[in-house]
Regions:
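Non-catalytic terminal and connector segments of soluble metabolic enzymes
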Residues: 2-6, 10-176
Length: 176
């Protein structure tokens, strides 16, 4: 079944077969203009899908100044704010919402350190990025941030809840 879903869809604690608990979360990921221009969007998206994360929202966006300022509002007044806005408005980007067990932490680990020179090999930034100002990807850093950012980039009707047969093989049976 496919339906529109709210940005805040979190299933709570779900026991997995090993007896530990996972939390199904949603998180925002942006493939920034450098990732789009370098034609890495598909490779980056594939890494998340290969890990078992589910795409529930995806679009190519030409970012205007207003959207950039809303996204970077926490940095308003900082010396690098204008540089952030200029970069994110310089070319289209890919915005997506990913869903999965502990998605926020998993995505942050997969993305790697903000400074590509400090990012571990095997991470997106460690493998593909060179310069901090052009580090390919933005990923929400906490649940509250994810909820806010998803609301900035996506309307509720742009997010689609659906079940995948593969979920039982990726995350196991889920207690509702």
């Amino acid at each position: 079944m496919v339906s529109a879903a709210p940005a805040a869809r979190i299933r709570g604690n779900n026991p997995n077969p090993k007896g530990t608990c996972t939390v199904t979360e949603r998180t925002l990921v942006l493939v920034k203009p450098d990732g789009v221009q370098r034609q890495l969007a598909g490779r980056i998206i594939a890494r998340f899908e290969e890990r078992g994360l589910k795409i529930v929202g995806l679009k190519l966006v030409r970012v205007d100044r207003g959207l950039a300022e809303r996204h970077y509002a926490v940095h308003k007044g900082k010396p690098f704010f204008e540089q952030l806005v200029a970069f994110i408005t310089s070319s289209p980007l890919v915005a997506m919402v990913l869903e999965g067990p502990n998605a926020i932490g998993m995505v942050r680990t997969m993305v790697g350190a903000t400074k590509p020179t400090e990012a571990a090999p095997g991470t997106i930034r460690g493998d593909l990025a060179v310069e901090m100002g052009q580090n390919l990807v933005h990923a929400s850093d906490a649940r509250e941030t994810a909820l806010t950012e998803i609301g900035i980039w996506f309307r509720p009707d742009e997010l689609v809840a659906y079940e995948r047969e593969i979920d039982r093989w990726v995350i196991g049976p889920q207690a509702e």
